[in-house]
Design a protein with these regions (language model features):
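Conserved AMP-binding A3 loop
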Residues: 48-51, 178, 187-211
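Structural core segment of the AMP-binding/adenylate-forming
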Residues: 26, 65-66, 93-169
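A short helix-loop-beta submotif of the ANL/AMP-binding
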Residues: 60, 72-73, 79-103, 107, ...
């Protein structure tokens, strides 16, 4: 094709000079370059990047087997556990959009979001079974419910058709996941909390998520392979994009179910934490923690 601009002649986009911006590329690269580096720490769980990558692929495959694909919404009602991190990759790897629900909301609000976002699948932790059960009774949509059984979770009712680990096992680690065809395709759907009226939906696209993730690195002057403590909820603006940021840096995600001083101080010492996030109230809680909590 000939153009009036000489710099555009025979320079159309192709696989050699262009790829869509997406945080999914971060996981693929990190698993290839640092397969044996620790990716996730949670209780007694230790997984490297290759293992984590394969689990994300199997999640994408399992969702695809349910008929989930581009434009479908997959919701999660999860604390900061490994499954929440995996959902940030596995859900968009099958073309779907992740809706991370605020675990502090009431059943009526959760029901509204499930309906408004048209969720086809819901990943949920048994700690929130009372709220989720009521929400499912209130909402018009009937998502497929998958229980995430975390060994550190308190008691609760299992509500789903299947359990998360069994669901993953139904997937294929050789599943041919693909980048988005357009970097403006949606990767996640978030909702406002604490506003007047009903929650308002906010869409992230792959391009924006990738750029913000990289922006986190430059803003913090982050060094290679950080050790990040999950004190910030992943449901809060997708954890400010740090699920993707830490992955891009080949770092280690140290999961934390509850943001409490004792476990935070313990994790900082035990896992040599280099970075963490938190609202001022979280930092104030740490500053004002008891001597016993600080020594935990």
């Amino acid at each position: 094709m000939t153009s009036s601009n000489k710099y555009e002649d025979n320079l159309e986009k192709n696989s050699a000079n262009y790829t869509e911006l997406t945080p999914l590329s971060f996981l693929e690269r990190t698993a290839r370059v640092f397969p044996d580096h620790t990716a996730v720490i949670h209780g007694s769980i230790r997984r490297n990047w290759l293992e984590t990558y394969k689990r994300c692929i199997k999640l994408a495959s399992s969702l695809s087997n349910l008929g989930i694909g581009k434009g479908d919404t997959v919701a999660m009602m999860l604390p900061n556990v490994p499954a929440a991190l995996e959902a940030h990759f596995g859900v968009p790897m099958c073309g779907a959009v992740l809706n991370a629900l605020n675990i502090r909301l009431d059943a009526k609000t959760i029901a509204f979001i499930l309906d408004h976002g048209e969720s086809k699948v819901l990943l949920t932790d048994k700690e929130f079974s009372n709220t989720v059960k009521e929400a499912l009774n209130l909402c018009k949509s009937k998502p497929i419910v998958i229980d995430v059984q975390d060994s550190l979770a308190p008691e609760g009712e299992l509500l789903g058709e299947t359990e998360y680990e069994s669901f993953l096992e139904s997937g294929d680690e050789d599943f041919g996941w693909q980048y988005p065809k357009d970097e403006w395709d949606a990767i996640s759907l978030n909702y406002t909390s604490g506003t007047t009226g009903n929650p308002k939906g906010v869409v992230y696209h792959h391009r924006g998520a990738a750029l913000n993730s990289i922006g986190n690195i430059t803003t913090w002057g982050m060094q290679h392979q950080p050790r990040y403590l999950w004190t910030l909820p992943m449901f809060h603006c997708n954890g400010w994009c740090f699920p993707w940021t830490i992955t891009a840096m080949g770092g280690t995600h140290v999961c934390l179910r509850k943001t409490e001083p004792g476990p935070i101080f313990q994790a900082i010492l035990e896992h040599n934490i280099t970075h963490m996030c938190g609202a001022p109230i979280v930092m104030g809680m740490l500053v004002n923690a008891s001597s016993k909590e600080k020594k935990s």
